[in-house]
Regions:
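Amphipathic alpha-helical assembly/interaction segments
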Residues: 1-154
């Protein structure tokens, strides 16, 4: 969590969304889901549930990126992180549906993806809480600190 404040701040830290651990995990998960649909699903699912789960998995990292791009505005950042979390939940639902209907029969693949999505959802919750508590935008925080210091000095 050392860099969390820096992650949430802005360009002063020289960071990109690519530096966010949560984005990296979301991206890895989307790639794993994509591969699962190509390697483990029957052909008839490729354009049905397979398409749905690919889109919802890719939406997680895409919403993190879009939120990060709007990080100057705390509520916008949080809004897109909440969208990312909702997409994570949607992806879990699609995965469970594929497994329970017998379209995904590989229990190891199901278990690994399920655990990865569960971890991602928990980490998204922690990240959202962190942004809510420690959001920094740069200039406004400097002005606020300067006002507090001026008030204490008088």
């Amino acid at each position: 969590m050392r860099a969390m404040g820096c992650e949430v701040q802005d360009a002063r830290c020289g960071m990109s969304y690519r530096d966010l651990g949560i984005w990296k995990l979301a991206r890895e998960t989307a790639i794993a889901v994509h591969r699962m649909t190509l390697e483990n699903l029957p052909k008839f699912e490729m354009y049905e549930e397979g398409s749905q789960i690919r889109r919802s998995a890719k939406s997680i990292s895409a919403n993190i990126v879009e939120g990060y791009g709007r990080r100057r505005y705390k509520q916008e950042f949080i809004r897109f992180l909440v969208f990312a979390h909702a997409s994570c939940d949607e992806t879990i639902e699609h995965l469970e549906m594929l497994f329970e209907t017998g379209s995904l029969t590989n229990e190891l693949v199901y278990g690994d993806l399920s655990a990865q999505l569960d971890l991602l959802g928990r980490k998204l919750n922690v990240f959202i809480d962190s942004v809510e508590r420690s959001h920094r935008t740069g200039r406004s925080d400097i002005s606020e600190r300067a006002s507090r210091i001026a008030h204490l000095a008088s």
